[in-house]
Amino acid sequence: MEKNNSAKRGQQDGNQQSAQPEKVGWVRKFCGKGIFREIWKNRYVVLKGDQLYISEKEVKDEKNVQEAFDLSDYEKCEELRKSKSRSKKNHSKFTLAHSRQPGNMAPNLIFLAVSPEEKESWINALNSAITRAKNRILDEVTVEEDSYLAHPTRDRAKIQHSRRPPTRGHLMAVASTSTSDGMLTLDLIQEEDASPEEHSTCEESFRVDLDKSVAQLAAGRRRSDSENVKLSEKGRSGTLPRHEVTSWDKPTQRKDSLDKGTVYTPQVPKKLSHSEKNKCASMEEILSRRDSAHRAVLRRGLEAHCTAAEPEQLSRLQELVALKLEKTQELLTEVKGYGEGKRKVKDCATSTTTSSSSSSSRSDCERILQESERLLGEASSTWSQARRVLQEVRELRDLYRQIELQQVDCNPKQSSQYRKSMM
C-alpha cells in the first residue's frame, strides 16, 4: 500500500512540475497590522495545479519559492469588502479561507489585487483550482495488486464492423408507412421488372372491356345473320341435309351464341398471391385516396363512349330485329306448308296397300316430321333471340336517358360551384 501511494505521489509531482502555471502575477499580500495602518507587501504569486506558490521575487523554479500552500486545505476564495470603508482598496480585496476540519493548520490568506477585474480573475482561477484539488482527493483509490481486475479482451485486435445494408422487406415496410403517397413502393416494384398490364389505370381497363363487349355483340349478330341466311336458302331450294348438325342442335353452342349476343360482363378477379399483394399494396392506398378523381374520369369515359357509339348501335340493332322477325315469319309459313304436306301424305299412305309403297311413304313421313321439328325449333329460338335483342335495345335506351339526366343534373351544380368560387 505504501509503495503504491508513494508511486502515485511521485507521478503527480512530476506532472505538476511539467505542467504550465495557470495564473501568475504580482499581488499585494496582507502581512499584519502596525501601530497606525495595515502592512501590505508585494508578492509574486504562481498558481500551478493544486498548489499556490508565493515569493518576494519573480522565480521560474518552484524550489526557490518562500511559501507553498496546498489548495486542498482551503474551502473557497471570495471577495472581502468592508461595509463602512470608502477606500479604493475595499473594491480589490479577496481572501482564501481554509476549510474547517480538525487538524487543518493552513492560515487564511488575504490579497489586494491591482484592479477589480484582476481580483475577479484571481477569484475564479483559485476556486476552480480548489474544486480540482478536492476531486483529486476523492478520485484517488488505492488498489492492491492481488485484487486487480482482469481484462481478457483489452489486448484483443479491434475490427471495424461496417453497417449492414437494409433488407428489401424493411424498405417495403418503411415505404408503406411513409408520407410520400407510396412513391418509394412504386419505385421498388418497377425495379422488379413488373409487366405493363399491372400499371394500367382503371379508365383504360374500363374502355377495353367496353370495346370488347361492343365488338363481341356485333360479331355475334353478323354470325347469326349469316347462318340464318344460309339456312333459309337451303330450305327454299328444298335440299335438306340429313346428317348436318347446326348450331341450334347443340345446347352448349346455343349458350355460347347467346352469351356472345349479350353485353359483356367482367370476370371475377383471381386471388392474388402474397408477393402480388405486397406489390399492389401501395397502388391500393393511392386508389383509395383518389376515389373521387377516378370516379369522375370513369363517368366521363362512359358518357363519351355511349354518346359516340349509341346511334350506330341502335340503328344496327333495329335492322337486326327486323331481319329476325322476317325470318321467323318465313319459317312459320314453311312449317305450316310442311304440316299440310304431312296430312296429304298420311291420306295417301292409308289408300295404298302394297308393301313397297307403304315403306317408302313411311320413310318420307319420318323425314318430313324431322325437318318440321327442326324448323319449328329454329323458329322458336330465333323468336326468343329477337325478343332478347329488343330487351337489350330498351336497356340501352334507358341507360342513355339516365346518362343525359345525370349530365343535366351535373351542369347546374358545376355552374353554382363556379359562381361560389368567383364570389
UniProtKB/Swiss-Prot annotation:
Entry keyword Ribonucleoprotein: no
Ranges of Basic residues composition bias in the record: 83-92
Family matches, as SMART domains: PH
Record GO biological process: regulation of myoblast fusion
Keywords carried by this UniProt record: Cytoplasm, Membrane, Nucleus
Residue stretches making up the PH domain: 20-131
KW Transferase (keyword) present: no
Region (Disordered): 1-21, 81-100, 217-277
Location, primary (coarse class): membrane
One Gene Ontology cellular component: nucleus
Biased composition (Basic and acidic residues): 222-259
Skewed-composition ranges (Polar residues): 7-20
Location(s) in or outside the cell: Membrane; Nucleus; Cytoplasm
Matching SUPFAM superfamilies: PH domain-like
Record function comment: Plays a role in the regulation of the actin cytoskeleton through its interactions with actin capping protein (CP).
Protein name in UniProt: Pleckstrin homology domain-containing family O member 1
